[in-house]
Amino acid sequence: MEEDLFQLRQLPVVKFRRTGESARSEDDTASGEHEVQIEGVHVGLEAVELDDGAAVPKEFANPTDDTFMVEDAVEAIGFGKFQWKLSVLTGLAWMADAMEMMILSILAPQLHCEWRLPSWQVALLTSVVFVGMMSSSTLWGNISDQYGRKTGLKISVLWTLYYGILSAFAPVYSWILVLRGLVGFGIGGVPQSVTLYAEFLPMKARAKCILLIEVFWAIGTVFEVVLAVFVMPSLGWRWLLILSAVPLLLFAVLCFWLPESARYDVLSGNQEKAIATLKRIATENGAPMPLGKLIISRQEDRGKMRDLFTPHFRWTTLLLWFIWFSNAFSYYGLVLLTTELFQAGDVCGISSRKKAVEAKCSLACEYLSEEDYMDLLWTTLSEFPGVLVTLWIIDRLGRKKTMALCFVIFSFCSLLLFICVGRNVLTLLLFIARAFISGGFQAAYVYTPEVYPTATRALGLGTCSGMARVGALITPFIAQVMLESSVYLTLAVYSGCCLLAALASCFLPIETKGRGLQESSHREWGQEMVGRGMHGAGVTRSNSGSQE
């Protein structure tokens, strides 16, 4: 009966890449390949027809064809001149985002004094920015998944630039409240630059490159403080708002150089455009393109919220939402607390200052002094060691443990602030706390694009960013309003939140260290091959000895 089916001779070895595609190349020694054999059987296969005569679907094409996926092309082309240019351009977007965020801690006390605003209106001025970011983050993610990463990013940057400059001309409080809210709406799309950036990076360089992009965030925060030192005393806050939009203007001019993500193009069926993009990158990097045919991924609905809550991603999504919430809640809370603590001298000084203020005037205020700006600059510089520490540990401990460690150290530093310490020790504790909470934020930006597939990557990052904005929305009322009632309760809230976030990081079901980016919502490419004739008897074995 076996002779009726086929004559046993020799079974040619087929090499399957981790992404699912395959090739006949015998000298292909790339890591992650496995030889698949049937023990004890040597077969010469003859062509057979399907019983029903149906054609094999395109996505189930013959795995012995010379084919490659975008992941293979990105890995083969490697990191080069193109990625360096993209790093600088993406970094400009991050620098602009950081400056718009940092300006809140500088603008709030200035307007508090200049316009005689009560504390709740000062807090609302900060919160309205985060309301805009929260309401738009998911929208920008959906636009990026539906219409392309470049499209979503370009529109959001132009939007932010326009309303950022307009807000400098606000005549009264209500106007600046509305305009800064619209600025926040645009900033909600800036994190999509990470989605675009990550999809052009080879696996080994991805974590390091995304973390190094965060250096631009640190540069942005430091530059904003330095700019405020020189601009605020002479030109005032309006010029500070205008000059803070310069990085956005540069990005808006240069963003037309950006290509669309090849992964997005393949997923949306634009094979020719994806190949053209990959050839452009290969030319700029001076690297060869892989031989063979680019596989077109099975076209799926993109940017659907329900895909974030499939059984495979449900817990990941919920835990990530809380992690991002805690990151932003604690990070921006610390930024706002820093100016309050420096003005008071220490934690105990806030209580004594509160009594003096109440006796004098409910609208009493203090402008930031030169000493306050310098100490603010020192704590802002902590962003740089935060990047370096995270860069060193993220590929050693993994993404989950890195986030957990950062949350724990921030929580510990927050508890130490309960002690009435001098200004120097206060600055040191704030420096360490900010370094590690920014490191946790950076690790989350590495993990999130890695854990979601291309079809929902932008939406996943967008919803996480939206939850971060919820935390940032709430934090002014803790760091600026609750602080007046109880300093210790305020610090306890931040410390407790980060301890819970550390636990959430440990319970994330997927560790993405060493994983390639997924193209499909299917966990493994082999699941897309279900239905294809693979009925050979025997045991499947890989060179590594593990079953695939």
Curated annotation (Swiss-Prot):
The protein's UniProt keywords, in alphabetical order, are:
Cytoplasmic vesicle, Membrane, Phosphoprotein, Synapse, Transmembrane, Transmembrane helix, Transport
One Pfam family in the UniProt entry:
MFS_1
Instruction: Tell me the domain of life.
Output: Eukaryota
Q: Cytoplasmic face: residue ranges?
A: 1-87, 144-156, 202-209, 260-316, 395-401, 446-457, 511-548
Q: Does the keyword Phosphoprotein apply?
A: yes
Q: Which GO terms describe its molecular function?
A: transmembrane transporter activity
Question: Any keyword Manganese?
Answer: no
Question: Which sequence ranges are marked TM in the entry?
Answer: 88-108, 123-143, 157-177, 181-201, 210-230, 239-259, 317-337, 374-394, 402-422, 425-445, 458-478, 490-510
Principal localization? membrane
The UniProt entry's GO biological process terms, in alphabetical order, are: xenobiotic transport
- InterPro entries named in the record: MFS, MFS_dom, MFS_sugar_transport-like, MFS_trans_sf, Orgcat_transp/SVOP, SVOP-like_MFS_dom
Q: How does it sit in the membrane?
A: Multi-pass membrane protein
Please state where this protein is localized: Cytoplasmic vesicle, Secretory vesicle, Synaptic vesicle membrane
CDD domains (alphabetical) = MFS_SVOP (cd17441)
Q: Name one GO cellular component term.
A: basal plasma membrane
Q: Which SUPFAM superfamilies match?
A: MFS general substrate transporter (SSF103473)
Q: Which residues lie on this side of the membrane: Vesicular?
A: 109-122, 178-180, 231-238, 338-373, 423-424, 479-489
Q: What is this protein called?
A: Synaptic vesicle 2-related protein
Please tell me the species this chain comes from: Homo sapiens (Human)
